[in-house]
Regions:
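Cytoplasmic membrane-interface regions of multi-pass membrane proteins
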Residues: 71-81
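Hydrophobic alpha-helical transmembrane segments in integral membrane proteins
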Residues: 99-117
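Internal/C-terminal transmembrane anchor helices
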Residues: 81-104
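Intrinsically disordered, low-complexity sequence elements enriched in Ser/Thr/Gly/Pro
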Residues: 1-4, 82, 384, 391
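Non-catalytic, solvent-exposed segments at the cell envelope interface
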Residues: 115-116, 120-123, 128-131, 137-518
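Membrane-anchoring/interfacial helices and their immediately flanking loops
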Residues: 1-37
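Membrane-embedded alpha-helical segments of integral membrane proteins
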Residues: 22-73
Length: 518
């Protein structure tokens, strides 16, 4: 054998005296890489706590077996170069898979920590002037007369007013009894500026005659108060066996956080029985005319959220005679990113319709909005995020308006669940989790969510999802949040449908399959 061939032989196989060649060292490095990745994976998964005891034991055994087999091949000085190289490549592939899984586990835990924060109890109060007013800052309003609400939201109004007066002295004010009176006073030049809770802009936008209030005015100052977060709920050790009820609330506020004290445009009770794998979704029209639990006066259900998410929960508890255990608050605009990250969703519409022009987020992610109209066919529609947002918002195209919108919103929820449960999510799970982190807030403890994930991994059974949307009679009446100046569009509850919903809820809680009696 020539010297050159002997040197090449020794490089790959090692010398006859037992030194290692390149193939040996490559194999050992691959083994070390897989060993480190195995430890990281095990630490991440055990830290997440999402696996059952049986699955944890299986994972440990698999990791020990894989590392043991590769050590058996790579540790001895052998001349089987092909075997060492093949095992080394396999080890690197497995290491990459472990890194992917470890990253996914870390992203999942970060996501759970973010969404279980409960949302923000922050309240933002604005100083508003007419659009043609020369004032650009609050200091420019020296000498202005400020309009304020006499009773509604008085605590936040007084806090903002006190803050303003600390900077420029006493402010002259004029009180008004209702929100529409306050808006009229500003637009008709009875006052120069008004102090208005940020949540009331959406109320005025949805009130006939005031839809253009935001365009006719401008905000020159914002004052925020960070109120104490709601008391955390203790984890429920029996969450995977006992039924529970979640209030799913959707908000369309244009803020960079998930508010707990704003209108709720979607009101769905999710009744979940883990033992029977039954889920019942009960949708209540946003304009349902109900008594406010804390005030005794009647208002639209959507306005209940202005007084805090607990007010909405109490109202639905009274309506359906059931205890609500948790809430999940969803920011509609943020769901655009979730659906786009999923690659779109499929919804099966029972009607064909065209939406009116509505504001949707710009595609460049700038946070700005533009008007757009969409068309949907009867049957299956594949929707991107903006189309899904329009599909879930539209109500003017239907004779039964808000009731059909509620049904469409449940279709979007089902579409998201179906797509999220498919293998397609693996390609973009990080984008989905990142978008969802900014769009969802719940007071369900992280430990309870993990317990439910464990339960699902243990039996892998499917879930039976039943939906029920309530309807009512379109009418007009006074609303507490708007005052007694005029009657506003409301939906009077259909008592028979309310009774049916109550019965369906109790069926699920009793462990039965929900069935609507004819």
């Amino acid at each position: 054998m020539s010297r050159r061939r002997r040197n090449a032989y020794s490089s790959y196989y090692g010398s006859r005296g037992g030194s290692r060649g390149l193939a040996d060292w490559f194999g050992l490095l691959a083994l070390l890489c897989m060993l480190v990745c195995s430890v990281i994976l095990l630490v991440r998964v055990l830290g997440a706590g999402v696996l059952t005891t049986a699955l944890t034991v299986v994972l440990i055994l698999v990791l020990v077996l894989l590392n043991g087999l590769h050590a058996f091949v790579q540790l001895p000085v052998r001349r089987n170069v092909a075997g060492k190289l093949i095992c080394a490549v396999v080890a690197l592939v497995l290491s990459a898979a472990m890194i992917f899984t470890s990253t996914a586990a870390g992203s999942l835990m970060k996501f759970l920590s973010n969404i279980t924060s409960g949302g923000s109890a922050k309240t933002t109060t604005c100083v508003v002037v007419r659009a043609d007013d020369p004032a650009e800052t609050v200091n420019d309003t020296f000498g202005y007369t400020y309009g304020i609400l006499e009773t509604l939201d008085r605590e936040n109004t007084d806090a903002a007013l006190s803050h303003i007066e600390d900077g420029m002295g006493q402010v002259k004010t004029a009180g008004f009894g209702t929100l529409t009176q306050l808006a009229d006073a500003l637009l008709n030049r009875q006052v120069d500026a008004v102090i208005l809770n940020n949540s009331y802009f959406s109320v005025l936008k949805g009130t006939e005659g005031y839809q253009s209030f935001s365009k006719d005015t401008k905000v020159i100052y914002r004052f925020s108060i960070d109120k104490a977060d709601p008391e955390p709920i203790a984890p429920n050790a029996n969450i995977s066996r006992e039924p529970f009820v979640v209030y799913c609330s959707g908000t369309d506020e244009r803020v960079d956080y998930i508010p707990l004290n704003s209108r709720s445009d979607t009101n769905i009770l999710a009744v979940v029985n883990p033992s029977t794998h039954q889920i019942l979704l009960v949708s209540t029209p946003r304009d349902y005319y109900l008594p406010l639990p804390s005030y005794g006066q009647k208002d639209k259900l959507t306005h209940f959220g202005l007084y805090g998410i607990e007010e909405s929960i109490k109202g639905l508890e009274q309506l359906y005679n059931v205890d609500v255990n948790y809430y999940a608050r969803v920011h509609f605009a943020g769901l655009v990113g979730v659906i786009d990250a999923l690659g779109g969703i499929d919804v099966n519409s029972d009607v064909a319709f065209n939406t009116v022009g509505m504001e949707v987020p710009d595609e460049d992610g700038s946070g700005n909005f533009h008007f757009a109209a969409y068309s949907f066919q009867k049957g299956v529609n594949h929707l991107d995020g903006r189309q899904a947002l329009a599909f879930a918002r539209e109500r003017d195209a239907f004779d039964d308006g808000d009731m059909q919108r509620g049904r469409n919103q449940m279709l979007v929820v089902q579409g998201i669940v179906n797509k999220a449960a498919s293998p397609a999510i693996l390609k973009s799970y990080q984008d989905v989790l990142a978008a969802a982190s900014d769009s969802i807030a719940t007071n369900m403890p992280k430990e309870d969510i993990i317990s439910l994930v464990k339960m699902q991994l243990q039996d892998m059974s499917g879930w039976n999802i039943t939906t029920y949307g309530l309807a009512g009679e379109n009418s007009a009446d006074y609303c507490y949040s708007l005052g007694n100046d005029a009657r506003y569009a409301v939906v009077r509850p259909n008592e028979q449908m309310v009774a049916t919903a109550q019965d369906l809820i109790q069926q699920v809680l009793r462990g039965e399959t929900p069935t609507v009696n004819p």
